[in-house]
Amino acid sequence: MVLNTPIGRGGLVATMNYSDFQLDDNATIQSLKILINQCWKTLPIFEGKDKENKIVYSREEAYENYQKHLCFLITKVSGASKIWQDNQYYVELVYMLVGMQDFKEDEHDRVKYIVHHCTKLVINMIDVILNNES
C-alpha cells in the first residue's frame, strides 16, 4: 500500500510504501511500551484528573476526554493491523478498546478492570517478540 501525504502548504507530498515498512524488534518493543503508558493514562483521564493527579474536570468533561483518548488509542492500534494481524493479543486489544467506547460515565470499576487487562495484552505482545513467537 502506498500513501501520499501532503506536507505543509507548498504542495509537497511525502510517499511511503507501507508494504516495505518494518520495525526491528527493539523499536517495536519501545513502541509497545509507549502504548502501555497510553493505556494507563485512560483511567485518570476517565476520572477527570490532571498530570498532578488532581481532579480538574467535571464528570461530563472527563467522559468526553476519555472518549477522545479512546479514539486516539483505537486509531493508533488499528494503524498497526498489518504488523499484528495474526497476533491473538493484538486482536483482543482492538476488541477491548472498541468495546470501551460503550462504557458509561458511572462505570469506573469496569474501565479500571479493562485498562489493566489491555496493559496485560500489550505485555503479552512484548513477550511474543522476546520469545520470537509468531
Name what the model sees in each region.
Residues 2-63, 119-126:
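Short terminal alpha-helical segments
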